[in-house]
Amino acid sequence: TGDEDVFPTYLEVSFSNVCNLKCTYCAPEASSRWVEELKAHGPVKLIEGTPYEQWAQGYQDLDSLQYKNREVNPYVDAFWKWFPEAYKHLKVLRITGGEPLMSKETLKTMDFLLEKPNPDLEFAINTNLMVPDKLWDQFILKLVAMRDAECVKKLTIFTSVEAWGK
């Protein structure tokens, strides 16, 4: 009838674009460092007439991306109202970013999973692994607790190696 609730089985969520890096393949929507770069130096100069020229000009209004950096985010608030019911139907939950380990919502999500185990859920996080030690330690403690509690079917960490050395 169209009135039924529909819940996803796969959910990818980004709580924030706060990030400590500006990877070459990333964009301001997913990296606050790219927002800072574009505000300081303007859009990247691209070859005129290419499809990418129009893409770069789309970043003229960088303030529209700042809601993701605010302490109070209406989208995150809405997520937490919706998630407890949707969670029951999930098979895969993946947190992306920004850098997810820099968002308090990531640890809050992990706490939720510990409190409400789902043995059918695959839980994944994308991370650059370059966060301060305090955040890293908190994350590892939560991961170990999740593993020991067997509160999810599978834990996966996705990362990339953008560069190495100095």
Question: Residues of each region from the PLM?
Answer:
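Generic structural signal for well-ordered alpha-helices
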Residues: 80, 110, 140-144
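Conserved Walker B catalytic segment
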Residues: 109-115
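A short, Lys/Arg-enriched amphipathic alpha-helix followed by its capping loop at the start of a domain
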Residues: 85-86, 112
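C-type cytochrome heme c attachment motif
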Residues: 21-25
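Donor nucleotide-activated moiety binding/catalytic core segment of transferases
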Residues: 4-5, 82
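Core AdoMet radical
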Residues: 8-18, 29-74, 87-105, 116-166
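Conserved RecA-like ASCE ATPase "motif II neighborhood" in helicase/translocase motors
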Residues: 74-82
